[in-house]
């Protein structure tokens, strides 16, 4: 999300939303807080008009930039085949799948698909694995080869981009929060469908 807002703008937006910077990039949470803060800051409700204007301008700028990044990702869809990651559950057959959250599509079997083996997948030893972690990591490498620049968080939803963007180490805790973001993001946003 380095192409969305400057660091100072991002900090200001997160401060207005009442969120810690560790939540930067968790778009579903940010949206929920934005709607809540709109009610709180609205001048007709006795709120602060200046804060409301600043919140709106920063949030709308973020939305426009994220939309642009997602459009660029859609143009890159030819890099992979949707058959590389598939759900055989009945729930996956109902359209429009690409606009549904990953958690809605995979439901109870999400945990089975997110990571096959912690030790093997995180070290990159199992190149035939099609768990979400390995698939998104392979996609990260493909994007790097094609565009000759490393993709960043939101351009790429892999665990590596998540950790690099937020400055986290590999740990069960950071993995837990990454998979929660994947769970609450659309199939199209993550890049798991066309």
Swiss-Prot record:
Keyword Zinc listed: yes
Record's subcellular location: Host cytoplasm; Host nucleus
Domain remarks: The common region of ST and LT proteins comprises the J domain. This domain is essential for multiple viral activities, including virion assembly, viral DNA replication, transformation and transcriptional activation. This domain is also required for cyclin A-transactivating activity of ST.
Which InterPro entries does the entry mention?
Answer: DnaJ_domain, J_dom_sf, Papo_T_antigen, Papo_T_antigensf
Q: Which UniProt keywords apply?
A: Acetylation, Activator, Early protein, Host cytoplasm, Host nucleus, Host-virus interaction, Metal-binding, Oncogene, Phosphoprotein, Transcription, Transcription regulation, Zinc, Zinc-finger
The J domain extends over 12-80
Q: What is this protein called?
A: Small t antigen
* GO molecular function (one): zinc ion binding
Q: Which residues are annotated as modified residue N-acetylmethionine in the UniProt record?
A: 1
Q: H1C3-type zinc fingers: which residues? A: 140-161
Quaternary structure (record): Interacts with host PPP2R1A; the interaction inhibits PP2A activity.
Q: Is Transcription regulation there in the keyword field?
A: yes
**GO CC, one annotated term:** host cell nucleus
Q: Where are the zinc fingers (C4-type)?
A: 121-134
Task: Spell out the Pfam families in the cross-references.
Answer: Papo_T_antigen (PF02380)
Q: What is its main location?
A: host cell
Chain's role:
Promotes efficient viral genome replication by accelerating both G1 and S phase progression of the cell cycle. Inhibits host PP2A by binding to the A subunit, thereby displacing lower affinity regulatory B subunit. Inactivation of PP2A in turn results in the transactivation of cyclin A and cyclin D1 promoters. Late during the infection cycle, ST may induce dephosphorylation of host MTOR, leading to the inhibition of cap-dependent translation. May establish and maintain high levels of viral genomes during persistent infection in cell culture.
Name the source organism: WU polyomavirus (WUPyV)
> Source organism lineage?
Viruses, Monodnaviria, Shotokuvirae, Cossaviricota, Papovaviricetes
